[in-house]
Amino acid sequence: MWGLCKNHFPSNKIQVQERNKALKPKKSGSEHKTKQLFPVFNCKKKEKGVMIRFAILRNANTSLLSARSICLFTQAPTYCHVRLNTLNKSITTKRNSLTESKRHVHDGKHFFTTPHQQQQTKLGEIEEGHSPNIKGEDLRSIGQAITHQRNKRRKQIWSAIFGGIFGVILGYSLIYRVIYLKEQSFLPLFPSSKIRKLSTRDLKKVDVNQVQKLSKLRVLEILSGHDMIKEQYGVPLLDKDGNSPTLNEFSMWCEDQDPCVTGIVMEPDDKRDSSHTWYRIPFVCKWRITHRPISIRGTIDDLLNRIGLETADLFEIISPERVYGSFKYEYPLQGDSHALHLWFHGEIELDDDSLIVYNGKYHVDVKLQEIDLFRREKNGQLVQYVLYKNEAGDK
């Protein structure tokens, strides 16, 4: 139903204006300032009353006072109020934006980044383990644990590599060559010197006393024809007691032509007698430590023989210095796979201040390489005189 409160509502324009003046709230300080900033808008000219109709049920018991209050409080806002609220909101938004922009400019941490991006970066560092809360000792312990694990892994890899290589070599030398094929096998260990002392087995094949006598005769023969010895010591050459000079020291050693290695020789355990000293592994093999040369030419010959060729089919090397007495015409010791140079060294004392020192090589006959005279002069200096030197010989 319409118009139950008709007597309490204004019916013309004049009554509407009077009612708006009565209901208009007092101006606050902020609204007054806003009106001064924007004086263009005239609220009196724009104000208009709005008639609101209410539909009340037929059987509802509503007093006129309550109906009038409903009408007053539900009146729609005027155009001026809406405009002022909009302006206030826009001014507040601008002030906030200016404040934020100034804060971003004056804050050096966020000159190129925003606080939101920095927060994400910190979160990412914390997830990766770079948290500032973690102590330096913890970081060092973690680093040491990682380093220890890597070193342990590296040692395991190298141990596996060397273990595999050693297993392959030992399996081929011992299991395949000795046990399966019943052959001799040599396992090299480390390089050795070409010069070594004569073993007891070598001394049995070389007459050292004969070499000593022959070398002394050859030295006295050469010294008797030397001019310096004739003038200062006389001929025949005698010692301070007037007797024939004697040897104070004499030694012999052998030298291989090729580089040598020290290794282990392994053979099947056949229990045969041998001049060597063997160590036995019952029912498996016997072994001993020995020296062997590395013959490059012999290795090439073996490779060519396997394909049906010989070294003479490809080339032949003839050295002009290879004459009688050199290594080419020397015979190897019985039972050895290579020939040896047998060297000797001797000393003959003439008097208290004079000493003859010589060295040479022996093969069937003595071949001297050098003879020196060491003499202490009157001023106390020790002087070496080279009396003989074989330039064509091999040292």
From Swiss-Prot:
A single cellular component GO annotation: mitochondrial membrane
Subcellular location: Mitochondrion membrane
Keywords: Membrane, Mitochondrion, Transit peptide, Transmembrane, Transmembrane helix
Spans through the membrane: 156-176
Topological category with respect to the lipid bilayer: Single-pass membrane protein
The family this protein is said to belong to: Belongs to the AIM39 family.
Stated name of the protein: Altered inheritance of mitochondria protein 39, mitochondrial
Organism for this UniProt entry: Saccharomyces cerevisiae (strain Lalvin EC1118 / Prise de mousse)
